[in-house]
Amino acid sequence: MPKSERKILLDFEKPLAELENRINQIRELAKDCSSVDVSEQIYQLEAKATQLRQEIFSSLSPVQKLQLARHPRRPTSLDYIQAISDEWIELHGDRGGSDDPAIVGGLARVNGRPVVIIGHQKGRDTKDNVARNFGMASAGGYRKSIRFMEHGNRFGMPILTFIDTPGAWPGIEAERLGQGEAIAYNLREMFHLDVPIICTVIGEGGSGGALGVGVGDRLLMLEHSIYTVASPEACAAILWKDASKASQAAEALKITSWDLKKIGIIDDVVPEPSGGAHANPLQAAENLKTAIVKSLDDLNHLSSPQRRKKRYQKFRSMGVFLET
């Protein structure tokens, strides 16, 4: 989990931060003047802070959820892997000369059960983000991920994927190396794997970059994550030639977990701690682990042919339209 670092505040969090700072100041003053009892005042302010936190995080707009999904302190794939795994061995390379750092994966045990885990990996700071390409995988990253999936399928190990990317890397080099083909190959192969596949959006789920590791029997989303065909900024720039209309685009795109659950795109929403996953990473990881274990237990009751059939039907039912 992330170490304690300088707190980064989003605009809608500032009133809460001011109240928490006031509580801390009163506590410090009480230490210097032990004869004054401020316990009742602190109790009232803490109750007010709890209520304010609940009000803020229960009524977030889509664009505010987007800000949370992109929060620099939000737990990454490696944070969750290390928190939910009994054991973890990272694997490397696509066996074609590439080892894309934007994709991590390997073998793990979750509640004693051997699994393969794959995820997009963002950086923790600017230097790390540059090294990880901000979680935007290239063709080699998707070939690396399908290699790990095929390994899991060969040995009967369920596959867990963590999605957290603005999208696949759009660079010329990525296109030259077959970015589109690599993602398309993954989509086709994931439909045919025999083992259970559980995909979880832990932050940003952007376009084909998310889909490249996003075909599964269960699609989960953390409460304040987002899943979209295009970023709200890109959508606004395309439709209205004005990226400043991102808030309007975010509303129209239905990018939030509860919107997507309502229209049947995802299967379940994993609750986050009050204040978001970055406010209590360990609790967020525990919630995620509980949801994954439950999904694995449910999927184990199905045969491989049943899982493959339901997986295919699940994705075929998305985006159905009628011609008139």
Curated annotation (Swiss-Prot):
This is Acetyl-coenzyme A carboxylase carboxyl transferase subunit alpha. One of its GO terms (cellular component) is acetyl-CoA carboxylase complex. Its EC number is 2.1.3.15. It holds the Pfam family ACCA. It is found in: Cytoplasm. Acetyl-CoA carboxylase is a heterohexamer composed of biotin carboxyl carrier protein (AccB), biotin carboxylase (AccC) and two subunits each of ACCase subunit alpha (AccA) and ACCase subunit beta (AccD). Pathway: Lipid metabolism; malonyl-CoA biosynthesis; malonyl-CoA from acetyl-CoA: step 1/1. Residues 44-298 form the CoA carboxyltransferase C-terminal domain. It catalyses: N(6)-carboxybiotinyl-L-lysyl-[protein] + acetyl-CoA = N(6)-biotinyl-L-lysyl-[protein] + malonyl-CoA.
